[in-house]
Amino acid sequence: MIRVAINGYGRIGRSILRALYESAKRDRIQIVAINELAKPEAMLHLTQYDTTHGRFHTQVKLDNQHMIIGDDAIKLLHEPNPANLPWKELDIDIVYEATGVINDRQECEAHLKAGAKQVLISHPSSNDVDATIVYGVNQDLLRAEHTVVSNASCTTNCIVPVIDVLDRHFEVKSGAITTIHSAMNDQQVIDAYHDDLRRTRAAGQSIIPVDTKLARGIERILPHMKNKFEAISVRVPTINVTAIDLSVTLNKRVDIELVNRVLKQATEGSFSGVVGFTNEPLVSCDFNHDPRSSIVDGTQTRVSDGHLVKLLLWCDNEWGFANRMLDTSLEMIKAKRSS
């Protein structure tokens, strides 16, 4: 059993907790504490009720600065400085760093100084972390001495396994990506001030282009893809589930049937449970609460001139990513204990 703490109980933090309680990993992972500046009553309410993922299936209550879920008592903390958190006292193996604002090694080391053994960041990080992992592709890079690890981003986890399969079978020459991402909490409900002028506009009324570093994220996981990809991203007025429009030029000649067959075989083999494949006529809400990192929509595969391939990928940008946080943390402990 590994003892974990969640720092930051927002969309991803709560999804991690819910994903754990809906999975078979509860016999291996125990959430010991949650650090969040919000009031306990609000934390309880947002655990019980969720607009996107529905009601929590287990009874939850507060008792003496603990959140009680079934027979589990999770300590609630409200400390703004990670260095002051009682991780040593609580014997924390891994901190899930889910605030969204702590993303470099120096900031994460505050958790280590407080007594945590390792930190897993729930978003892209600076280059000074020990490793950036996309589960299913490069978790074998984890080493016992790694203390600060990034789980990359939901979109990187969605697209990299598919690029990896295409490259191994057909040799990817170059690619272009459009991420069609649900609205996020860094946007405005109605027009209001933001450093990004496009994000001053109401999230529910427009398709809003935003900056993305997805192409650089691909390079970090697949270094041989350096300078081969470019990406743009738009936010759309939905609350969850993201689509990715992926176009790649391949060195080998292909057709639609071959591309779909290879991708489907990968989902039944090495990427089982991580990448899915569908030929059903589905829409974005059909992938809500899907635990996989990526689902290839085979009905939308297109091939031009035998070498240019266009794919449509789906992912639940909250739930799929939260499940990968659990998977990566187990791999971190496995690497640490195998030394």
Swiss-Prot record:
Please state the pathway this protein functions in, per its UniProt record.
Cofactor biosynthesis; pyridoxine 5'-phosphate biosynthesis; pyridoxine 5'-phosphate from D-erythrose 4-phosphate: step 1/5
Which major enzyme category is it? oxidoreductase
Residues of the active site are C154 (nucleophile)
- Kindly indicate where the leader peptide sits in this chain: none
Known InterPro entries for this protein? E4P_DH_bac, GlycerAld/Erythrose_P_DH, GlycerAld_3-P_DH_AS, GlycerAld_3-P_DH_cat, GlycerAld_3-P_DH_NAD(P)-bd, Glyceraldehyde-3-P_DH_1, NAD(P)-bd_dom_sf
Which residues bear the site annotation Activates thiol group during catalysis? Answer: H181
Which named protein is this? D-erythrose-4-phosphate dehydrogenase
Source organism per entry reads: Shewanella halifaxensis (strain HAW-EB4)
